[in-house]
Amino acid sequence: MQPMHIVQLANFYGPRSGGLRTAVDQLGAGYVDRGHAVTLVVAGRAHDDEVLDSGVRRITVPGRKFFKVEGYRAASPVLIRRLLPRLGADSLEVSDRLTLRGMGPWAKAHGIGSIMISHERLDRMIELGAPRRVATWASDVANLGTARSYDTVVCTTAFAGEEFARVQAPNVETVPLGVDLGTFRPDRATPQARERWSHGADVLLVQSCRLSMEKHPARGIEIVRALVADGVRARLVIAGDGAMTDELRRQAYGLPVVFTGHLADRDDLADLLAAADVAICPGPHETFGLSAMEALASGTPIVVSRNSALADVTRDGCGLPAADTGAAFTAAVRAVLDGDYRRAARTCAEQYTWDRAVETMLGLHRATADRRRFLRDRPAGGRAAVAPARSSGAWSTQRAV
């Protein structure tokens, strides 16, 4: 099979980007391992051009700081459009629904395949600052435009795809991401790791997430406050950084809560997750929940928001869902501590492999690249062998933006 050149585009890619960065890096490395060329274009402080250990060429384009936390930068689409013709891509893989949404039409105009990976629920994000009715309307208009602009839209779970199903987008594929089963393992739960992170506490809780509003990061503090009030010798380790760090430290004052900041060392994070009794995953908008999957791979059960994609994962007996209140999460944590959930945790995580995700994504890239190449190279005025037209009914309800 002929090798492809896949160009990945990802603003907001940085050391603290969490699941997005992990997904982009794992997919890119998998493509290279299978003989394809990969160029990753990201935003940063200054221009850079380097080859990563994975074999991926990473080009950094100067970008402006987008959020309060360092590492979230966005490069101008104009700069990226100037760069793309020099790269010779067969297919684009875009991991940004906001600042790079115009890359799909650009790819079509240049005969290049295009895939957009939806890493979040747009309707949920808009709803953080707008009434639900407004959020639904705005996301429907935007999602309709996105689906029309790209050859394929990839969602990581059925939950993530619900907002595209609502506008009847016909070009949506569900591709679950993977988890690093080699790094995150139950056998890391050694007495040394337990002592390091628990400091003698009877119950060790972990919460690994970005400390920003949409993640509901104060939930873990509410839980440990309730447990301590009932005489439980509990300790909470919060691994992550974000705009709410100072506020959360104030809330946790006087409680057995430790803030590690961003844990850049994956081995440290893996030891922590394996040593914990329960991983708290409070974000109600998670479309996949990579940090939760890393906890499960480590053999640690999870307590999750019943309004996120992770609620479906817990049906396999690896944890419990809870309503988005401190009391509900505390009750679920108590139930998990009293139950037998660890056995199912690793088994659940083993269903999600990067090999499977990479192979599925390569199939989509091949299909879109071949179709665009055919349309680009057919004789002028030729009409034969074009792809069947899609039903107009799915597109006609609203004008794309």
Protein language model regions, located:
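Conserved donor-binding/catalytic core segment of Leloir-type glycosyltransferases
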Residues: 198-225
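Nucleotide-activated donor-binding/catalytic signature segment of Leloir-type glycosyltransferases, i.e.
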Residues: 246-263, 267
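Carbohydrate-associated surface elements
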Residues: 159, 178
